[in-house]
């Protein structure tokens, strides 16, 4: 049986063998792997770029106090981004499942058309969900726009739902029974690593978080992001955009924002991410000269 730790390592190993640079998780909370600058910003460059990484993801509204068998407020995606997109990407994906020990010929694997959109990132793309015996385990997306900018060349993003995939590979019915690792002292389960955090962060995000402080933080990070864009610094500006988005997610979980206001906040974050993307793209030629020395 493959452990959760081994599965993540093998995915990195597989995509590294396909030419992807393995980078580390980003150090700012985000709701999805697409927020990582290695995807959001680097997908805008006109030069080839291939990258893969584990993406710890936080979605406070999805927390369930550790009581739901497959719904979490904090979880892990595995992300691979390849630009330009190879013609055999579906074949490579199936080989990645085989690399994890899955006999793809004896399972019902379906590519179901499902176009993707991220309103806060001004991003959308064409793609599929991948269903493994009736359970969605992966999302494929051919990026058409990121930050409101058309992607040329087009990159393909593969996002694995790692917990769902591990549940299937290990034959368990709840995420908390996933075997995280194993050594001479026995097995470490997902519950040993994460269940208490699910309980405590659910209570914080739904009941305790200081909304007045969070509104002030959102406004401060947004203003600082705009100031940093004006200073022509897209990378720190995008960090501030990510921080504002993360703060919004907690406010959303706290139900501190009405439906009408919610859309306005999403548009504010979209404008910030768009400003970062436009500046990053505009500086591409000069940045390449600086980087190449």
Swiss-Prot record:
Gene3D superfamilies: Bira Bifunctional Protein, Domain 2, Class II aaRS and biotin synthetases, domain 2
Stored InterPro entries: aa-tRNA-synth_II/BPL/LPL, Gly-tRNA-synth_heterodimer, Gly-tRNA_ligase_asu
PROSITE patterns for the chain: AA_TRNA_LIGASE_II_GLYAB (PS50861)
Pfam families, alphabetized: tRNA-synt_2e
Localization per Swiss-Prot or TrEMBL: Cytoplasm
Keyword Translocase: no
Gene Ontology terms describing biological process: glycyl-tRNA aminoacylation
Catalyzed reaction equations: tRNA(Gly) + glycine + ATP = glycyl-tRNA(Gly) + AMP + diphosphate
Coiled-coil residue spans: none
Keyword annotations: Aminoacyl-tRNA synthetase, ATP-binding, Cytoplasm, Ligase, Nucleotide-binding, Protein biosynthesis
Any one GO molecular function term: ATP binding
UniProt keyword Transport present: no
EC number: 6.1.1.14
CC per GO annotation: cytosol
The protein's enzyme class: ligase
Entry protein name: Glycine--tRNA ligase alpha subunit
The encoding gene: glyQ
């Amino acid at each position: 049986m493959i452990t959760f730790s081994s599965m993540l390592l093998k995915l990195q190993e597989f995509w590294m063998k396909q030419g992807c640079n393995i980078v580390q998780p980003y150090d700012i909370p985000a709701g999805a792997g697409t927020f990582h600058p290695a995807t959001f910003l680097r997908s805008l460059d006109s030069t080839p770029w291939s990258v893969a990484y584990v993406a710890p993801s936080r979605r406070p509204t999805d927390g369930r106090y550790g009581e739901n068998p497959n719904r979490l407020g904090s979880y892990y995606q595995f992300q691979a981004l390849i630009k330009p997109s190879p013609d055999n990407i579906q074949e490579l994906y199936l080989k990645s499942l085989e690399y994890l020990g899955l006999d793809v010929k004896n399972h019902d694997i379906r590519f179901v058309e499902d176009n993707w959109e991220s309103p806060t990132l001004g991003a959308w793309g064409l793609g599929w969900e991948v269903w493994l015996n009736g359970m969605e385990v992966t999302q494929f997306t051919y990026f058409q726009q990121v930050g409101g900018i058309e992607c040329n060349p087009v990159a393909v993003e593969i996002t694995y739902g790692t917990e769902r995939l591990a549940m299937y590979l290990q034959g368990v019915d709840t995420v908390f029974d996933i075997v995280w690792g194993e050594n001479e002292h026995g097995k470490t389960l997902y519950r040993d690593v994460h269940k208490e955090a699910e309980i405590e962060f659910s209570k914080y995000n739904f009941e305790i978080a200081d909304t007045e402080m969070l509104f002030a933080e959102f406004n401060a990070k947004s203003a600082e992001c705009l100031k940093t864009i004006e200073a022509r610094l897209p990378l720190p500006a995008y960090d501030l955009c990510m921080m504002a988005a993360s703060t919004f997610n907690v406010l959303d979980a706290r139900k501190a924002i009405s439906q009408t206001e919610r859309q306005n906040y999403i548009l504010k974050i979209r404008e910030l991410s768009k400003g970062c993307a436009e500046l990053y793209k505009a500086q591409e030629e000069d940045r390449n000269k600086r980087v190449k020395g």
